[in-house]
């Protein structure tokens, strides 16, 4: 097969994958790229979450963990009710919600992995101050999972990696030479700044 024919096939395949992977984000209806199967990402997130639970020290503050779980359950119910009322498919169907409180006073953070795996660090509790503040932080993190931002980001990463490999092939390996000469993934770095994290 000649080079031109090969590039046509690759180009058509990439366009097909991109078009097939386009969908709309829940609530905002914003177009987003989703070429990574959500179930795969959820399974990977669940495995990583288990490792985090083994590695990190969990807080023994049962009252605070119960508060986190209570806030989470209320949000789960609100999300479900919203999508039922709106007659929209619930993007959290299939989520296996779980909540942990990690004992790290220096870490002022919380996050929600794909599939509803949520962690709150004890350090952020000084900032949130009360149930309302904690609910605001948790709501923000859960919104990322509802909007499927991780799936979109992983899909962009795959597409970017494929494009970078294609550019390297077309340039006769020049991109790899630049990376070796500079000791860094030049395109990866530039794309991280300009494409993956534009704001």
Description of each model-found segment:
Residues 2-199:
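A Zn2+-metalloprotease active-site environment signal
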């Amino acid at each position: 097969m000649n080079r031109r024919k090969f590039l046509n096939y690759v180009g058509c395949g990439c366009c097909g994958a991109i078009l097939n992977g386009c969908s709309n984000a829940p609530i905002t209806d914003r177009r987003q790229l989703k070429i990574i199967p959500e179930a795969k990402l959820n399974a990977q997130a669940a495995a990583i979450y288990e490792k985090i639970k083994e590695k990190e020290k969990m807080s023994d503050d049962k009252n605070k963990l119960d508060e986190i779980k209570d806030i989470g359950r209320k949000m789960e119910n609100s999300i479900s009710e919203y999508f039922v009322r709106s007659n929209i498919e619930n993007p959290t169907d299939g989520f296996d919600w779980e909540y942990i409180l990690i004992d790290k006073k220096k870490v002022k953070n919380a996050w929600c992995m794909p599939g509803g795996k949520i962690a709150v660090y004890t350090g952020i509790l000084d900032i949130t101050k009360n149930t309302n503040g904690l609910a605001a932080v948790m709501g923000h993190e859960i919104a990322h999972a509802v909007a499927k931002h991780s799936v979109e980001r992983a899909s962009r990463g795959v597409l970017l990696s494929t494009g970078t490999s294609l550019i390297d092939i077309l340039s006769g390996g020049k991109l790899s030479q630049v990376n070796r000469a500079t000791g860094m993934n030049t395109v990866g770095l530039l794309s991280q700044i300009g494409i993956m994290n534009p704001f």
